[in-house]
Each structure stands twice: as structure tokens, then as C-alpha cells.
Amino acid sequence: EWIEAGWVLVDGVPAVLGQRVAPEARIEIDPLARTQQAQRVTVLLHKPIGYVSGQAEDGYQPAVTLVTAANRWAEDKAPLKFHHGHLRSLAPAGRLDIDSTGLLVLTQDGRVAKQLIGDDSPVEKEYLVRVRPLRPVPAGEHWLSEQGMRALHHGMELDGRRLKPARVSWANEDQLRFVLREGRKRQIRRMCELVGLGVTGLK
């Protein structure tokens, strides 16, 4: 693990697994090795469209492939140095669909994941959802009826399970603001479809 993380140097050069080492070679261990190895990392990533939150699927790359030293935020003042060990067991705490963009939390720490997405998590997730009507709307009627708005707030089921109450409001004429405390697969898109709306953008 230390070799994979780049913490072992042979004559000043990072060692590789299986490398043969001469008896006279100078072996060094990065002094941060023990402290960094004990630390579990959490990464905040702005996921672009076209990446999946978790494992690769249907030819699309997982968002974790964007976690590199080169992509680190220039103004990040954290003293922790990036190494490949940070990618081990780095899992998303929540999900964003492949065609959604926004904040994705990746963590090695199960405690962080539980706080964010556990059944009793108090953390709310906010989304801006651009929508359009799936069917022609009669003149004088709104895309979303009062009954439809009430259903979005409370009273829907997905896959036979009732959804937790949500806060939904209009952000502008074609964009809804959703505040959720859970994250089922394609939840917002499916909720919108149930009230006759299609999603054209989600962040």
C-alpha cells in the first residue's frame, strides 16, 4: 500500500510493485506515510454531465476518475498531499444521474456517508430542475396543477415505497427547486413524470 501511494522511494525515485532493489540502494519512507495512511479522506467534486456517480456503466466513466492531483482546487489550503491511496474505497455518498451536474461527495469514511445518506440523515439535498410539459397544456392552464404540486410535496410512491416529504417550489417559469432528504434512483425525473413533466436539466 505504501508503494502504491508513492511513499517508498528508491534512490529518490518512487518505487513500483515488484521492483528489484540493489543492496546498496537508498530506501526512504515519506515521513507523512504513517499519518496520512491513518486518515480517511472525503472529496467534494463538481460532477459534470456524462459521468456516473458510482461504478462505470454502459461505457461511461465513474466520477472518481476525475479525482487527480491536477484537478485539485487551486485555492485548497488543506495540507494533505494527494496520493493514489486516497482513491481506494472512495465511494459516493449520494448520487447524481449521468445527465445531472452538481456537488458529489466521495468519501472513505462510513461515518460521513451515514450522516449524509443514512436513513436518519438530517441533511437536505437541493436541486434545480428545468422542466417542460410532456403533453399539450390547454390555454390558460399551468404546466403543473395544484394537485400535482401537492403530490410532489407528499403522497408519491416509487417502486412500492412511499417517498419522504419534499419541498418543491417554482424557481422561475420553467425551473423547479426540489429539497429532498433521500435519493432514490432517478427520483426527481420519475417524480416529475408522474405529474406530467419532463426534465430537461438538473443540477
Model features per residue range: what roles?
Residues 1-203:
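Basic, flexible Lys/Arg- and Gly-enriched helix-loop patches that mediate nucleic-acid binding at interfaces
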